[in-house]
UniProtKB/Swiss-Prot annotation:
Biased composition (Polar residues): 1-14, 93-104
Gene giving rise to this polypeptide: daf-19
PROSITE patterns: RFX_DBD
InterPro entries: DNA-bd_RFX (IPR003150), RFX-like (IPR039779), WH-like_DNA-bd_sf (IPR036388), WH_DNA-bd_sf (IPR036390)
UniProt feature, compositional bias: Basic and acidic residues: 19-92
Protein name: RFX-like transcription factor daf-19
Organism of this sequence: Caenorhabditis elegans
DNA-binding region range list: 260-334
BP term (GO), one: neuron differentiation
Amino acid sequence: MTNEEPVPSTSSVLSAAEKNVKIETPSRKRKGLDIDALWRKKFKDVENQKSPEKSEKSEKTIKEEPLETHPSGERKLRSASKDSKSLSKETHNTISTRSSSSGTPRKKMEPEDVKPNIKMLKKSLPVSFQCSNLNDGTVGDASVMLDPTKISLHSSSVAYGEESQDEMEVIQHSTDDPNGTREEFDYNQIEYGNAVTPNGTYTLYAPDSNYAPYYQYSNNMQSSPQDNAPYLVPAPQSPVSIDDADSINLPNNQRASPATVNWLFENYEIGEGSLPRCELYDHYKKHCAEHRMDPVNAASFGKLIRSVFHNLKTRRLGTRGNSKYHYYGIRLKDSSTLHSMQHPQPQIIQNTYTPPMQLPQRDAYADTVNQVAAIKYMDVEIPDKRARKDNSSSSSSCRDSVSPCMDLPAQQTIQHTPVHSVIPSTQQPAPLHNNNVVSYVVTESDKAAMGKIDLPIVPFPDKDALMATIGFRKLGVGEEELNSLIDIYEILCREILALIKNIDFASVEDTWSKFWSGNFGVDRDHISALCTLDQVQDYIIEVDLALYQTIVDTLIPNVLLSELSTGMTQTCRTFAKNIDVYLRKSLMLANLGEFFVKKKIQAIKYLQQGLKRYTSLNHLAHASRGVLMKPEQVQQMYQDYIRVDINTVHQQAGWICGCDSVMVHHVNNAFKHNLQRMSAMEVWAEWLESIVDQVLAKYHDKPANVIANVGKQFLLNWSFYTSMIIRDLTLRSAMSFGSFTLIRLLADDYMYYLIESKIAKAGKQQLITVIRADKDWPLTTNPQEYIVVANDNDEDLDLEKAGLL
């Protein structure tokens, strides 16, 4: 039993045996309302009205004795009625501190007025619940029929007047034993009675021991961002971003692309002067639009600026009512192309400083306010407000988005690689014109991830069969020009592949432009004439698809096991976004037909799609590898997974999918076995491949369309089963839920990739061409299964909008 201070009339159950009952009622507190204090004040006022000289003794008695033992004689039960309900609101206003006034006479009250209606409670008491017997101090079992007269209620809540009970704060019950230790009890509560009295509504609760706790309590309150030590707090460890011990303190730079940082260095420099923040952000948004990047918000861009150019200060400059925030200490470079976008600004005064009050007119002040502020603060060291808030967090926008603060890893520097280091001196391309594209310095880890050191060989179709089907009478060209075109186009593909191997993406556009403008060994008129032939168009498209597949295989030789760095992944994705723009600009230099241009643009979309999907899959594999390398996380995953009722999952999912129960249990046991053994990523990859091989084993000699249909159905079944397992883990509040979600995403995407590989092998086609199969508009004269059509409604293929026609 606890020795807590009892609160009068918060709970009582039976009048016949009140002396055997003690009600344990922890305080119910909410903002601006102390229930215990209200009860003590109420009784003190009652005793003062009876006997003012005994008020002190009465107060002491209330503090030391519960309601049931208060020497007030025999208690009388009050029945709930409409009259009592109407009186409740009136007496509530009497005890409320908010509604009390000196002008209203206080109503004389008796101690009985504060008692709950126990008759209503008695009628609705449960026949069995956990409680303590005051006679012997024991706690009764939930299955034993107990006398309701000998119970100890664990908690209660009180609602005054018209206030909702949902607004009352529920406080966890706790007791202190004589040894000084504090014991807290977690239990589920059931509401079993309401008692309406003239002074309020009381809701009594008791623990329900028949229902085992399903959800674990977790504190949802977070500490204030102002209490964190660093200004930019790294994201906490999660299954998606597994940080090693050495990288915990690194800022998050996922949103700061190397192209943006390079653009800042090319156009801005630290120096005297100031730039309006809004204009600088407008420049940034235009840069993102030109490079097909998603711009961050203004607050995140401000953090990026401060991470690139340190010690920047912020000043609010301009006339009253028309002032703007400026970055002080940064200026545009003289060589920047942004000067054409810059608003005209008067030059900075270098020699004299004229106070604003001595200026003859307001316009002069408006014209020179920026220069005055710049000179005034030029040589004065003013403490920066941000320096005093190093330990504080930024605004809510910093928490809502990923911080773009740049701190590039070692050896991942940004610079332009000379073109002559990649292309042989005999065939140098034109000088580099696209300065906005960032070249990436290849590290040793990137070279190891590429796999092959030598240049991969691009397969070509049979040239003799092509030449045998072509008539040259009306073209004005002969067999020599055709052979020259085929040979030069092969050299072009090899040089493009060499640039890709050296991560010199900026030179790809120049190499294409040189070929289609007729400066690569073949006259432009000959190229235009030969490209009117369907056979030549089909040959070029086939070579392009083979080249694009080889580019993907070169950059990502193994989508699951290749360890691409963050800079390499971002560079590949940026290149995939912009490569169709490079091709459009190059094709404008040749006099090509509209149909052939559309097929070229559609073909390069395969490369874009493949690079984006496979870099995403590789990123998932990298994050999952971090989870699988930590034994404590894998052990927790195993403990959570063995609690999943796989029979129930199969019963629900099998009714829809109709899968073999033997195979389902085999996959389930293999998954648990891999978790228990803490298998490496290579083992998991082999296991997933074995599942696909087992599913498609009896279809190995079937056409590609049959394998595609079987593979699609398998992917649907796999996705449904995994979603049911994730649902079960969610309901159980599994601690490793995030890790399971990450592994599930990886498994789904890799299964998708494996099915694609099987279809491509059966159809003898390039892997990147499996998706978006449509036969309405083939890319070749003799359509194959995998050739994807160009959509007439696709704005990306609108040649007039693209400026090609």
